[in-house]
Amino acid sequence: MDLKELENGVNPDVHWYYQSKKLPLLRAAQRALAGGKPLTIVDIGSGSGFFALELEKRFGAQIAKIYLVDTGYSEGEMTATRGAKIEKVHAIPARIENGLVVLMDVLEHLGNDLQMLQSVKAACVGDNNSFFITVPAFQSLWSGHDVFLGHYRRYQIPMLRDVLRQAGFRCISNYYLYGGLFPLVWSVRRFRNYFKREPSSNMRPLNGLVNKMLLALNALEMKVSSANTFFGVTCVGEGKI
């Protein structure tokens, strides 16, 4: 999760984008819990911890431990949570068992995305670890938003699947989110790219009614999103490590 997206006063607890984006993650966690064992959540690039905390709200007692992994945490923040159920750390835990590894919009920030995935793979023990990854989709949507957030690239399914396979990830399922918004986002960004503007985030707080409408529409789409392998604003990868 990129904290820069929150600088314009966006509240992920109500904003349609975050509230809809968490839905496929919750489904992935439900599948990971099907074995009946308490789950360890490793949220890499967690920022505010929004997505991991949503998992804790939903599944609570079924989660044994949550690691919020982010190099932006201060020593004070890490010390305050050391040994707690929800712990802030700088590095990926050395040993992950029965885990769900979450990377929400992280890989696009890395010059070497494969190296990160290989580090995750090396930390996972056994064959009962799962992953859920989101990245921005389609290079044709590249804009000042990507520049502002420090992205290296946007992905399509073959590109994401290839790097996941290279890292040794298994049972990979890929699909797109926000397919319904793709034509509008594509048109707006192509138009804006004709003009020289200071790079900035597209994320803004919205009128309450508009926010509710967008949430309702996108929450509906999320019910069938796993069938969308054609186009969207976000690309998803999930499966086993």
Predicted feature descriptions by range:
Residues 6-10, 131-153, 157-162:
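Short, glycine-/aromatic-enriched active-site segment of Class I SAM-dependent methyltransferases
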Residues 169-179:
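Conserved S-adenosyl-L-methionine
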Residues 75, 139-141, 180:
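Feature marks short, surface-exposed loop/turn motifs that line or immediately flank catalytic pockets
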Residues 182-215:
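C-terminal helical/coil "lid" or tail adjacent to the Rossmann-like core of SAM-dependent
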